[in-house]
């Protein structure tokens, strides 16, 4: 009798857990569908704004982000030679379209990079050959260090 009650209780709990999982799965799918519909509506509005030339800075940023994500996803695909040629043509077409829009930012970034390359790094300015950060001599033989000590004593 006790075993039968235990089996019923176990079955009841398993059924309850199964129903909970189904409910969670349905809620997750509904959220995904709502999110996807929202994204599609947002993209449609952005496309209309882009066609009319009324994109805000936030919308441009969002479109650039989506473009970068799509490009990253496309790079992960394994392509045949024909597909690679088509992808290269598409890539050049996309770059031609978006290249002129973000030219000022690219020029500014390149100018900053050239300045950084021209300036020496701060950590290299403070380094001395043959010394560790604790100023202990490294890579010098005992003879060299004793010769220096003798010449210092003679002066």
From Swiss-Prot:
Biased composition (Basic and acidic residues): 1-31, 39-62, 115-128
Record's keyword annotation contains Transcription regulation: yes
Region (Disordered): 1-74, 100-155
Presence of keyword Metal-binding: no
Record localization: Nucleus, Nucleolus
Cellular-component GO terms for this entry: nucleolus
One Pfam family matching this protein: RRT14
Keywords of this entry: Nucleus, Transcription, Transcription regulation
Sequence ranges of Acidic residues compositional bias: 141-155
Function: Involved in ribosome biogenesis, probably through modulation of rDNA transcription.
Family in the record: Belongs to the RRT14 family.
UniProt name for this protein: Regulator of rDNA transcription 14
Organism listed in the record: Eremothecium gossypii (strain ATCC 10895 / CBS 109.51 / FGSC 9923 / NRRL Y-1056) (Yeast)
Encoding gene, per UniProt annotation: RRT14
């Amino acid at each position: 009798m006790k075993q039968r009650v235990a089996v019923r209780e176990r079955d009841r709990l398993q059924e309850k857990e199964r129903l909970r999982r189904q409910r969670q799965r349905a809620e997750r799918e509904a959220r995904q569908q709502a999110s996807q519909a929202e994204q599609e509506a947002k993209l449609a509005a952005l496309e209309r704004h882009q066609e009319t030339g009324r994109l805000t800075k936030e919308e441009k940023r969002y479109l650039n982000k989506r473009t970068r994500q799509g490009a990253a996803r496309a790079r992960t695909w394994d392509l045949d030679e024909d597909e690679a040629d088509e992808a290269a043509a598409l890539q050049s077409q996309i770059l031609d379209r978006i290249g002129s829009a973000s030219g000022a930012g690219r020029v500014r970034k390149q100018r900053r990079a050239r300045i950084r390359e021209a300036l020496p790094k701060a950590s290299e300015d403070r380094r001395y050959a043959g010394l560790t950060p604790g100023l202990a001599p490294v890579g010098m033989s005992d003879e060299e260090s004793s010769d220096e000590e003798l010449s210092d004593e003679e002066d």
